[in-house]
Amino acid sequence: MSDQSCIIIAIAGASASGKSLIASTIHEELCNELGCEEIGIVTEDSYYKDQTHLSFEERIKTNYDHPNSMDRDLLIQHLCDLKKGKAVDIPVYSYVEHTRTQEVTRFEPKKVIILEGILLLTDERIRQEVNMSVFVDTPLDICFIRRLQRDMEERGRSLQSVIDQYKSTVRPMFLQFIEPSKQYADIVVPRGGKNRVAINMLKVQIQHLLNNK
């Protein structure tokens, strides 16, 4: 593991399992305790591979729930840089165009970085770079309902396209890659992002890690 100047918490689990809600809740509450400049969220979705060389028709056929869809090398390099106190430029991904935009987001080093994404725990290299790993364990039917609503309302998707993607890639990839990665989690959180007891436990553990840096 790289020399540490920050604490990195990985939150994984199925799409629409409540990862983002847990991450944002912890972020908001620790902002009040640490200062908002000392804690930040990095999403794995930002590290989907650049597909600008492909046509739109080819991009929509990409299996975005497979580990190969991610630019893991860039994510790991950014984690290492942040732990060394270096700022990084995080890609901005477009869910409408299914590729990266030409923009980047400057992300400064923080005391606490919350890393959130479906496939984080499937990669041993990422697991080695984080201080604590969390798996949000929410029933797949609940995840599907949430994903359906989110993708139609926020990402301009049609009902049939969401259903087709769920059947062809989302569910199979969850069973093949995401669910088995639960074994690598330090903490498994049931009932998704509204599990108040689990959120409190995670905050206590983060404070413990900070105090023992």
From Swiss-Prot:
InterPro entries: P-loop_NTPase, PRK/URK, Uridine_kinase, Uridine_kinase-like. Its EC number is 2.7.1.48. GO terms for cellular component: cytoplasm. Its main location: cytoplasm. It is found in: Cytoplasm. ATP binds at G13, A14, S15, A16, S17, G18, K19, S20. Pathway: Pyrimidine metabolism; CTP biosynthesis via salvage pathway; CTP from cytidine: step 1/3; Pyrimidine metabolism; UMP biosynthesis via salvage pathway; UMP from uridine: step 1/1. It holds the Pfam family PRK. GO terms for molecular function: ATP binding; cytidine kinase activity; uridine kinase activity. One of its GO terms (biological process) is CTP salvage. Coiled coil: none annotated. It catalyses: uridine + ATP = UMP + ADP + H(+); cytidine + ATP = CMP + ADP + H(+). Keywords: ATP-binding, Cytoplasm, Kinase, Nucleotide-binding, Transferase. Belongs to the uridine kinase family. PANTHER family: URIDINE KINASE. This is Uridine kinase. It comes from Histophilus somni (strain 2336) (Haemophilus somnus). The lineage of its organism: Bacteria, Pseudomonadati, Pseudomonadota, Gammaproteobacteria, Pasteurellales.
